């Protein structure tokens, strides 16, 4: 069995930066409180928790005087202010690409546009971006969800950084026909684009694809969807222990693609297990 690895794959710049920033602070501080999971990979969060990371759901759970951490997905301005009232030090791990999307949302709303975000309204990154819009803001996952009230409105459109390019392009195309004026910012990050392209390319060369990453990772889910759309048999697993030996039978070439929040050590574990089978 031949194993081919998507290139690029695994940790993106923003997640690497967040982990490195968090690790530096953990080396100096016994406990660091993160508002929400710093990244979407349960195994890596477990490792960081052993170093002193504490994940909380609300600023009110952060003890007064404790060090706080802003996750890679970012948070709303209101949440940041709530942390500031409790923490003398806030370590900001927000991905720079997410920061750009936040700034675009703020600018568009100040210019009088209805801010339209292409993405998942339940995702923390999207919720954070929404907080920067000072006026009307709506999140749409597909063109079928566009409400009638937006017909004839000036709309400013941007994207969740991990959105599929095709989904974003389709949504923009629809707004061209219903809005008298649109302003578009493609805020899909370059790392996402590169990983999506690498999966498309690799899927045509293998007879099975393994997509590795957290179940709560939006970018990993998109990679799994792209692999399946390419027509290759694909499985999505969080770690090597979930790999089904039966799925591997009679497969001669296996492709591996890892989400942008999947650390190298998990990829290495998977390759080692495949080589032992």
Which functions belong to the PLM regions below?
Residues 1-277:
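The feature marks the mature, well-folded catalytic cores of soluble enzymes
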